[in-house]
């Protein structure tokens, strides 16, 4: 099975009203942990690489690890996605290396400049059958060393942006933020999910929810129990994510939850078995913790059982969509 494009994967999700998890990866164990979950549940999946991940692991290493997942699990639709590409050059590099989807994030620019940059990326990507996600509005928190304050996506701006750029998916700002500290407290959680359906109806394309880690209390407690310091971490309730999926969100970005699951498991090994020094003795439990974390999420997103619903279209075939 070839790599799946974001357009096809999210098009199916939008049609059948479920969400697909987009899980950030940095190394082999994360990819294996994610794949174990989606294989067990027969779910499509998006493996995405951020700028920080590419600096850490190198784009070629990560691409080859993701391709290994595709080779080992040919029955699972897999999209390899560049997360938060910030320049045309970085996006071109990912496309030329064989990524099936890219995000160009020019949301920190004024509207017209965001449109201009995004159109350049769309032209380059679509000529090669590659899907494009863009962002309008800004999320709070810190994403790869870039600090932002929240600016919610305006529905009419979203409609105009999609019409002008021709993007395949749009990341909308509805009050979530990057990182594990999304809100000051659980009582402070405020999300503008009411905007999602309006934007979905106006644009007619799949929407993306960034900053969607739930920061489960049991995982946070484990980290703190074994020497960590995350007392004030607060995430997005899974119920809010499910609500957003029902309104038009099709791609759900999750990063912090996987990191926390792996960190908690590794800390536990270090404290309970200080004699261990073989990386397999702690990376293995970390990998398993990711699987355990993601299984209930994937079920909640509704994508379980949908891996065999469609025949994946190759990038070469996908070029015809844009002619």
Curated annotation (Swiss-Prot):
InterPro entries recorded: Aldolase_TIM, Class_II_FBP_aldolase, FBA_II, Fruc_bis_ald_class-2
Pathway of action: Carbohydrate degradation; glycolysis; D-glyceraldehyde 3-phosphate and glycerone phosphate from D-glucose: step 4/4
Signal peptide: none
Biophysicochemical property: pH dependence: Optimum pH is 7.5.
Disruption phenotype annotation: RNAi-mediated knockdown is lethal.
Note accompanying the cofactor annotation: Binds 1 Zn(2+) ion per subunit.
Keywords assigned by UniProt, alphabetized: Glycolysis, Lyase, Metal-binding, Zinc
Reactions listed under catalytic activity: beta-D-fructose 1,6-bisphosphate = D-glyceraldehyde 3-phosphate + dihydroxyacetone phosphate
Enzyme Commission code: 4.1.2.13
GO MF term set: fructose-bisphosphate aldolase activity; zinc ion binding
Uppermost EC category: lyase
Active-site annotation: 83
NCBIfam families membership: cbbA, fruc_bis_ald
Family named by the database record: Belongs to the class II fructose-bisphosphate aldolase family.
Described function: Plays a key role in glycolysis by catalyzing the cleavage of fructose 1,6-bisphosphate into dihydroxyacetone phosphate and glyceraldehyde 3-phosphate. Does not cleave D-tagatose-1,6-bisphosphate.
Quaternary structure (record): Homodimer.
Protein name: Fructose-bisphosphate aldolase
Gene from which this protein is expressed: fba
């Amino acid at each position: 099975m070839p790599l799946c494009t974001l357009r096809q994967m999210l098009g199916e999700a939008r049609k059948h009203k479920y969400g697909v998890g987009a899980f950030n990866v940095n190394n082999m164990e994360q990819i294996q942990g994610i794949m174990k979950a989606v294989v067990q549940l027969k779910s499509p999946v998006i493996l995405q690489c951020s700028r920080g991940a590419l600096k850490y692991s190198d784009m070629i290493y990560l691409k080859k690890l993701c391709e290994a997942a595709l080779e080992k699990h040919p029955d699972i639709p897999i999209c390899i996605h560049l997360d938060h590409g910030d320049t045309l050059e970085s996006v071109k590099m990912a496309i030329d290396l064989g990524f099936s989807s890219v995000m160009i994030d020019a949301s920190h620019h004024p509207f017209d400049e965001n449109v201009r940059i995004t159109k350049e990326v769309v032209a380059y990507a679509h000529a090669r059958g590659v899907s494009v996600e863009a962002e309008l509005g800004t999320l709070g928190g810190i994403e790869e060393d870039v600090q932002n304050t929240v600016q919610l996506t305006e529905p009419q701006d979203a409609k105009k942006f999609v019409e002008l750029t021709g993007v395949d998916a749009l990341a909308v700002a509805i009050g979530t933020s990057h990182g594990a500290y999304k809100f000051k407290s659980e009582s402070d959680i405020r999300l503008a999910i009411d905007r999602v359906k309006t934007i979905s109806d106006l644009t007619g394309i799949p929407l993306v929810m960034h900053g969607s880690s739930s920061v489960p209390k049991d995982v946070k407690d484990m980290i703190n129990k074994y020497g960590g310091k995350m007392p004030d971490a607060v995430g997005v309730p899974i119920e809010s994510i499910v609500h957003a999926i029902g309104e038009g969100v099709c791609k759900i970005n999750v990063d912090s939850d996987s990191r926390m699951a792996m960190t908690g498991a590794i800390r536990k090994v270090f404290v309970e078995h200080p004699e261990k020094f073989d990386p397999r003795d702690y990376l293995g439990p970390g990998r398993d913790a990711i699987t355990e974390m993601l299984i209930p999420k994937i079920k909640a997103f509704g994508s379980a059982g949908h891996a065999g619903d469609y025949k994946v279209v190759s990038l070469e075939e996908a070029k015809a969509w844009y002619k």
